[in-house]
Amino acid sequence: MKNTDNLLIAKLKELREILNDSEDKDAAIRELHSIYDTVIEDHKKNVLDKWYDFAKEKRMDVFAIGDEIKLCKSREEDRDSYIKLQKENAIMPRAFEMDGFEDLLWGEACDEKVFCVSVRRKTDDVYMGYCSIKNIQKDDLELAVELLKEFHGHGYGRQALTLFLISIKEYAGIDSFKALVDGENISSQKMCEACGGKPSGIAEYLLHDKEYMEKYEQENQNEITDQMREIAKKFSVSPEKLLTHVLVYRFKI
């Protein structure tokens, strides 16, 4: 998410500068802990006492079949392609140099709280990406769709998301979802709208430091484009908010 990635990178750079000043090192460490705790708490918010566990769907080798793609149970052989996909979208590529980081990413994709299916091409079974519900234990189910760059621009994302939503409703009876999209990610916005997603305001993403975010918005006014102004109007928010927030699309199938 380009805008919010830039926000988080700016915050981390600021903390790195503080860490270089020994007098403020403790304050920076506390701030880093705060950011980490916020990410963890985001995963814990609004968790239901009971939820649909998708146990039946997770056991299905083939979840759904479309005209050009199929949605399948994740396979161990998908791991390398999934990691490649994460590298293509990484804001901190050096993290992949850390021991165990790739295992952590793959483990998160296969976690019991996630319902994730691989998107595969029908003709040759090639891995293209994935569709998922990020946390099935939440009361507000968030969608995620990512495809390898080589498959961008062919309508596969729209096909995959449509098939995913229709199939979930058919099997589980669930028909309400949301998706978070960066204000500069026009292709994902078009995909959401083509699949029936409706603009529904904005949301904070990872960083929740309101004072810092307001300062960032003021200092980066020059980053606001005419296109961002049009998008902000569609979502009924001030353009500068797209520098620090993500767009929310809601789906009712």
Language-model features and meaning:
Residues K2-E17, R30, S34-D80, L85, ...:
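Acyl-donor (CoA/ACP) binding surface of acyl/acetyltransferases
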Residues L19-S22:
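Secondary-structure edge/capping motif, primarily at the C-terminal ends of alpha-helices
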Residues K73, E108-A109:
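Short secondary-structure boundary/capping segments within folded domains
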Residues K87-G107, F115:
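Conserved GNAT-fold acetyl-CoA-binding loop/helix
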Residues F115-R121:
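Cytosolic beta-strand hydrophobic patch enriched in CBS
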